[in-house]
Amino acid sequence: MNRYGIQFQVKNSPSLDPEFMPILKFNRAFLQSAKKPVSFAVERSNGQVAVCNTFIHGTPDMREADHYYADRLVKSMLWLQGGFKVYVSGDEDVYNYLKETFSLTGKRAFDADFMAGVYEQPFEVVFCDKVPEEKGASQAIGRHMDGCRIGFDAGGSDRKVSAVIDGESVYSEEVVWFPKTNSDPDYHYDGIVAAFKSAAEKMPRVDAVGVSSAGIYIDNRTMVASLFLKVPKEQFDAKVKDIYIRAARDVFGPDIPLVVCND
């Protein structure tokens, strides 16, 4: 198979999509002849940065291949690790291509708009002499067994809550609800609060609350989640983004430890 001047072998060609190209095969063949160093970095929340140091060809005849490789690489970095700011160093032509591609009028407009919404920051692609250094922030989540704790799972068809004392479950409840078809965020809030209160009643106190649900959560805030699919954007911004923070605060006070994570 030849794609953008890059030749590689594909053992099995799917009959329903004979032009399907395994990206790993392309990348391996591409990097065999690419010699010009370039770097890409993607910045996300709290100053965290993902970095990829790699190579392109940097020649007119391989320009299309370079563009394709850079596009797929940056798109993968965005969806694997997230981010709102892309740094490019090493090649201005690739930078210009990515800047146009990941603009609100480019072919990756969805990606740019989505990430801007997730991080509440304008999405941008910038050129620099040297990309920022890699920076992550590990978190110790879970395995806290001491004290009186609540675990809440917000599912699409039911919500589950457990009360745990020193690692032993003393109460569990599963309630059917319909969050994906309800446009009123107060419906979701009331269901979350009801679950918190139900579990809290079975313990002498509540030391911490943990929440799991499908979606993108940053600093315990709901940035994207299918549970709130029908909620209008204005209502989502006003009542959904901080819904778990509000629910925990309203039931247990402002100082309750809370962690919300994608499951």
Annotate each predicted stretch with a short phrase:
Residues 1-80:
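Short Lys/Arg-enriched alpha/beta "domain-start" segment
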Residues 8-12, 22-27, 33, 55-58, ...:
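N-terminal, positively charged, Ser/Thr/Ala/Gly-biased leader segments
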Residues 83, 146-148, 158-159, 254-256:
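Short coil/turn connectors at secondary-structure junctions
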Residues 54, 59-71, 77-81, 92, ...:
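Glycine-rich phosphate-binding loop and adjoining helix at the ATP-binding site
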Residues 41-45, 86-93:
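Structural motif
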Residues 69-75, 145-148, 194-197:
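Short alpha-helical segments and helix-capping/turn motifs at coil-helix boundaries
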Residues 27-30, 36-62, 154-194, 198, ...:
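Short glycine-rich, Thr/Ser-proximal phosphate-binding strand/loop in the N-terminal lobe
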Residues 85-87, 140, 147-153, 206-210, ...:
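Short glycine-aspartate micro-motif
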